[in-house]
Amino acid sequence: MNQRRSESRPGNHRLQAYAEPGKGDSGGAGPLSGSARRGRGGGGAIRVRRPCWSGGAGRGGGPAWAVRLPTVTAGWTWPALRTLSSLRAGPSEPHSPGRRPPRAGRPLCQADPQPGKAARRSLEPDPAQTGPRPARAAGMSEARKGPDEAEESQYDSGIESLRSLRSLPESTSAPASGPSDGSPQPCTHPPGPVKEPQEKEDADGERADSTYGSSSLTYTLSLLGGPEAEDPAPRLPLPHVGALSPQQLEALTYISEDGDTLVHLAVIHEAPAVLLCCLALLPQEVLDIQNNLYQTALHLAVHLDQPGAVRALVLKGASRALQDRHGDTALHVACQRQHLACARCLLEGRPEPGRGTSHSLDLQLQNWQGLACLHIATLQKNQPLMELLLRNGADIDVQEGTSGKTALHLAVETQERGLVQFLLQAGAQVDARMLNGCTPLHLAAGRGLMGISSTLCKAGADSLLRNVEDETPQDLTEESLVLLPFDDLKISGKLLLCTD
């Protein structure tokens, strides 16, 4: 008679274990010997019946329970021990796409209690119960192989089972053989630290990450303060952030589909607390990451007129010399959008001439249109911004890259006499030449700007200078008397007055 032991489990499950005595076994349900597995000796076979899951939510559903079997001895092979560990881990998760789902009821491991006959351990549904069949536990294919054929790592539907298999140290020897008293013993893992499986990589070497491409800022920011979740593989910590969890490191190094880092997103969504957290934890190199439009977080902070964010980024060491797709630095953007407060923050702490670094600000740097910051401020007719730039060392006579105009030429083109007077008082060269040889007086005379022409003449402009077309300012004006540098001319005793 077979000895039958039955234990009830929660959720209408029943675990039945039968001990079948084999040849050479005198004590009923004794331990399996090594020869019994190979069919050359006696021993008993253990058969485990696992009923169908009732009340489970789909495939892989149902409560997890631990298998209790007689004490494991040396007769058990490592594939069998790994299979028991996978059973202890509970039901497996759904299979990954592209893999054929396993069929329930196939043998987990085989042992021969008698020569020519094999004892089978299988999972079979209980006919008295109905419900979805559970997926085959992980490690079944490995249990069917011999010790020499077992692969070191297998990927199937059972992620939890894979972890339990990896938690078994390969160098650990099999348990010592000894008599079994037949009492149920819990099947537990060998002692030792549990190692997490490493992430799978594709053929191109890119990391397969389930959160890749997520554009949700709320989910990303929640990882910074939420509870630590289990990460599939350990990651190397960034410099100076070794105390962070892998989940927090992943959130801090998040990059969206547009190339925006968490620092970019904190500026865009006006989240100063998150920005300060990033500045405190991340190294300076992360702050200079450019998105798909070649914009740094400093560019965006200036665009959105956030002086506090600009000051914090500058103090952290963010580069002020990086250019976007238009060749504009953050200061170019501040001049274009006339954000005076942001421009002040960018110019704070600027190193002395000749002592700058690669991250220092070059006020003479031109964008792809050939315009320096002073040129842009002049075209915007923003005199306070022009004063700020000149006070911080901007070259007043720097020429733009397309035609060689200076700020004074551009001020004449804006027809703002006040800007012309301001630049002349600041020391602008009154006879600065363009690439075609024209001076500011050529431009004023050719446009018929009599008031600006008079201002230039009073400042010492030469009305006889010729351009490449051999023209003087007097040749370009109809009223040549206006270009004379005198203000006390009299005709018939009457004072000649120059009016705008």
UniProtKB/Swiss-Prot annotation:
Serine phosphorylated; followed by proteasome-dependent degradation. Residues 1-66, 84-215, 222-241 are annotated as: Disordered. Residues 1-10, 196-209 have a biased composition (Basic and acidic residues). InterPro entries: Ankyrin_rpt, Ankyrin_rpt-contain_sf, NF-kappa-B_inhibitor. GO terms for molecular function: protein sequestering activity. Keywords: ANK repeat, Cytoplasm, Phosphoprotein, Repeat. Changing S157A: No degradation. Belongs to the NF-kappa-B inhibitor family. Interacts with RELA, REL, NFKB1 nuclear factor NF-kappa-B p50 subunit and NFKB2 nuclear factor NF-kappa-B p52 subunit. Interacts with HNRNPA2B1; the interaction may be mediated by the RRM2 domain of HNRNPA2B1, and HNRNPA2B1 may interact simultaneously with FAM76B and either NFKBIA or NFKBIE to form a complex. This is NF-kappa-B inhibitor epsilon. It comes from Homo sapiens.
